[in-house]
Structure formats: C-alpha cells, structure tokens
From Swiss-Prot:
Cellular-component GO terms for this entry: ribonucleoprotein complex; ribosome
Subunit note: Part of the 50S ribosomal subunit.
NCBIfam families per record: rplD_bact
Transmembrane annotation, as ranges: none
Function: One of the primary rRNA binding proteins, this protein initially binds near the 5'-end of the 23S rRNA. It is important during the early stages of 50S assembly. It makes multiple contacts with different domains of the 23S rRNA in the assembled 50S subunit and ribosome. Forms part of the polypeptide exit tunnel.
GO terms for MF: rRNA binding; structural constituent of ribosome
Protein name in the entry: Large ribosomal subunit protein uL4
Pfam families associated with the record: Ribosomal_L4 (PF00573)
Gene3D superfamilies according to UniProt: 3.40.1370.10
A Gene Ontology BP annotation from the UniProt entry: translation
Lineage start: Bacteria, Pseudomonadati, Pseudomonadota, Alphaproteobacteria, Rhodobacterales
SUPFAM superfamilies referenced in this protein's UniProt entry, alphabetically: Ribosomal protein L4 (SSF52166)
Length: 206
C-alpha cells in the first residue's frame, strides 16, 4: 500500500510504499486483546498483600476457657472470624505475568499497525529533526497538524532535540522503533512513524 509522506511543517515530501503484510492486514480484536492483556499483566506490580493469621500482632493465648462459657470454642484472637484478625487466603505479592509466544506478539504488533493504517490514523513523516529542543516550537507544529493524542515512532535512535521538545508536551509520546508496542499504539488516537521508523519496523517484523 502507498502512503503520503509529509514534513513537520505539513508540506508534502513524496510517498512511500508500505508492506501489506505489516500495514495492510484486517485488524483482529481478539489478537490485539490477547497481546494487550499480556503487556498489562507483565507491567502489573503485584505488590498486593494482607496480614494472615500468622502475621497479625496479637497474643496467641486462648481467649477464654474451652468449656462452660456457653460460647463457641476459640483459641487465638488472630483467627479470621474476629475483627482485626488475620485474613483467610488473602492476596499475597506475586507476578501476574504469563507467557505469550514471540510470533504471536509480533503478529499483534502487525495488527496494531494495520488498525491505524486502515482507519486513516497513520501518518508517515520524513523525519523529526528539529533545529532546537524547544517545546513551544513543537507545540505549534503539533497544533497546526491537528494532532491531539499522538505516538511518534522514530528509527533506532530518536532525534535528541525532538525528544527534549516532546518531553514536556502533553499528549505526545516518542518511542524508538525497538520500543514500538501494541498497547502504546492503541492508546493514542494518531500514530506517526518516520521513514526511518517504517524501515526499522519492516526489518524487525519480516
């Protein structure tokens, strides 16, 4: 498929041929869903924790005698049945990560790129070189281009001035091609890829 290439000042800069096997697939929600779940599960801290019976700070002394009180038989006040007692089978710190085949993850990335291309939310830039790393300059360019929530993917290395300018700009994320992932692509309304980024992604996913 053919895509128009523009510059940061919105002027045309020719066109580029995009690989249909990467940018021209029919997006499948089930594949995207599985990859996003894998990403978010891996990112989850898993630090949830509660105090169990052995963790609660109470005496282990039997609270009252076994027989003759008319009440139920109890031992320690740490039992889950009591207020401030330990929690029975509560959450403990653990990893939520699960495995997902490397080929499936690559397929998910292809479908994410294709979903932006098919909906017209993929823009190819010639490059993201800026003379100065000024946020005001980039903010003006982004406003004129009509970008609201945008992810910019560059080649192997991100232009230093562009990275500095975008760092303090709300709604603009910048990633190198190796950092391109399904979740970040779907999270933003517009996907912007430089020509160097397109070449790097096609080399990575072929």
């Amino acid at each position: 498929m053919k895509a128009e290439v523009i510059k940061l000042d919105a002027s045309p800069a020719g066109s580029i041929e995009l690989d249909d096997a990467i940018f021209g697939l029919e997006p499948r929600a089930d594949i995207l869903h599985r990859v996003v779940r894998w990403q978010r599960a891996k990112a989850q801290a898993g630090t949830h924790s509660v105090l169990g019976k052995s963790d609660v700070s109470y005496s282990t002394k039997k609270i009252y005698r076994q027989k003759g009180t008319g009440g139920a038989r109890h031992g320690s006040k740490k039992a889950p049945i009591f207020r401030h007692g330990g929690v029975y089978k509560g959450p403990t710190p653990r990893s939520h990560a699960h495995d997902l085949n490397k080929k499936f993850r690559a397929l998910g990335l292809k479908h994410a790129l294709s979903s932006k291309a098919t909906t017209g939310n993929l823009i190819v830039l010639e490059d993201i070189a800026l003379a100065e790393g000024k946020t005001a300059m980039l903010a003006k360019a982004v406003k004129e281009l009509g970008w609201k929530r945008v992810l910019v993917i560059d080649g192997a290395d991100i232009n230093e001035n562009f990275a500095k300018a975008a760092r303090n700009l709300e709604g603009v994320d910048v990633l190198p091609s190796i950092g391109a992932n399904v979740y970040d692509i779907l999270k933003r309304d517009t996907l912007v890829i430089t020509k160097a980024g397109v070449e790097a992604l096609e080399a990575r996913l072929k």
